[in-house]
Amino acid sequence: TNPEDTGIYNPNIEEFVKLIHEAGGLCAYDQANANGILGVARARDAGFDLCHFNLHKTFSSPHGSYGPGCAASCVVKKLEPFLPKPVVVYRDGKYDLDYDRPQSIGKARSFLGNVQVMLRCYAWIMSLGADGLRKVAELAVLNNNYLLKRLMELDGFELPYPKGGQRLEQTRYSLDKVFRDTGITGSDIRRRVVDYGIQSYHESHFPVIIPNPVTLEPTETYSKEDMDYYVDMFKEIIHDAYADPSLIKNAPEFGETSQINEDYANDERTRAMTWRAYVKKNGSKV
């Protein structure tokens, strides 16, 4: 991704792409963080061969409580024959499905995807137009830097890579100071957020290179009042982490679901996302 999940845009991206191309490779671009660069920078301008746009966040659509996601994939001309089939084409005055694609990689799961999300995004994009999409990016960056400034006023939030400075549409913070002082982890604090009527945030992708991470992405849609409430929530949670650590350790207090055994959930020997996988791993125990 570029900007990276730290919220920092890497200005050397064209040089990276050039080196890969010189070695005979192809470059793919995960546009998960395009919310802050719509109408400002394009994957094509950096020389990428393939990219995808997540419809959640960037195009103002729900992620569905961490899934299912939905995306639009874009490729350069030389990769077009390999796109999944069927492909929607326009011929003889009407739209049709083209299955005659001998070099295609075949179907990629359900062909239609999340239709309702795609229609919602299409209407949103068409209603905004090119100028409106650029405005979306500008507001997303503005919101994120306002939230960043407010959170850095709290004792407990740290900003690594590098310290200080602005970010684009998201920021990865560290709550390691709170952990060092109280033993309360970033995961403990994430669970406590639920008690304030807010969906818990994304901590970090793996590997975790920032200790006790917090990744916040306010986007363009949140008001100043929303973000101020969010900051006040963190201020109160951090205060409680020092004053009454057990309150945070046992969170969520009001959540419908209590804490789960994350070690069990993350163990490859037991984790099963489907019934078929569960049966395969448990065998005669089922």
Placement of each model-derived feature along the sequence:
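Short acidic-aromatic active-site loops that bind/stabilize oxyanions
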Residues: 2-6, 110, 137
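Conserved PLP-enzyme active-site core in the AAT-like
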Residues: 1-96, 103, 183-184, 211-212
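Catalytic-loop motifs flanking and including active-site residues across diverse enzymes
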Residues: 67, 113-120
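Non-catalytic terminal extensions of PLP-dependent enzymes
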Residues: 41, 91-108, 118, 125-286
